[in-house]
């Protein structure tokens, strides 16, 4: 694929961006955002806060991230988060289902997980979220959870479009892990 935006290596990073490099390779999202350090320094803390540990557990967040990424067909995010989702406690069958490779009903039997997937699908989908979807979310999640889940979908959508538009490459270690776990590249 054509490289649209070069990843800035740490020695060449602008001063405002260097703090996000941690003395090494920060990954393609940070290394490309470094072209505009004044946006990097506001975007990454928000993205980090949304993706980091919170009242929502790691597994829940990975359900949202993988499902959103699959619906948006973001190869980079699906591939990068598949190992993370497995590490968060999701089974291989559940991750395959979130990726859209098998039926969700065969992999998930927990009503909260299914409600989470349905809320994610509703927020990602075109047009307004239906009253039925809102009611289903209200039954399963408290208000703070609905807010955080919705922001998580939104941040994931932003990253999906960013990674897809720039055709960001997936780390070689991730590609190897996908193969070792029996997952094909997206």
Features from the language model and the residues they span:
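Short acidic alpha-helix initiation/capping motifs at coil-to-helix transition points
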Residues: 38-43, 73-77, 115, 123-131
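Helix N-cap / loop-to-helix initiation motif
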Residues: 56-57, 91-92, 130, 142-143
